[in-house]
Design a protein with these regions (language model features):
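Enriched for short, Lys/Arg-rich terminal
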Residues: 1-12, 16-23, 38, 56-59, ...
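A short, surface-exposed loop/turn module that caps and links secondary-structure elements
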Residues: 30-54
Length: 83
């Protein structure tokens, strides 16, 4: 099993999530622990090359894989790709 960590930005994003999304995030983080057998994952392109995302309704969990999984951002889909 792999370790899943949240960046400081992702920790702050998590605190701002609606309550129901926090429960769904827990499920997503559990799925990420079973890397590489993660369903619903998509590799990203352009400025997010090297990162992947999992959809959580209208929210996106952006992460990258190094020796473990680092969740970089957790944002609404209308905001996450603007950076």
């Amino acid at each position: 099993m792999i370790e899943v960590r949240l960046s400081p930005e992702a920790e702050a994003d998590k605190e701002r999530l609606p309550t129901q999304m926090k429960y769904r995030l827990d499920d997503v983080l559990e799925r990420l622990e079973s890397w590489p057998q993660v369903s619903g994952m998509k590799w990203l392109k352009h400025e997010w090359t090297g990162h992947a995302r999992i959809r959580m309704g209208d929210w996106r969990v952006i992460f990258r894989i190094e020796n473990d999984v680092l969740v970089v951002r957790i944002q609404h889909r209308s905001e996450v790709y603007e950076e």
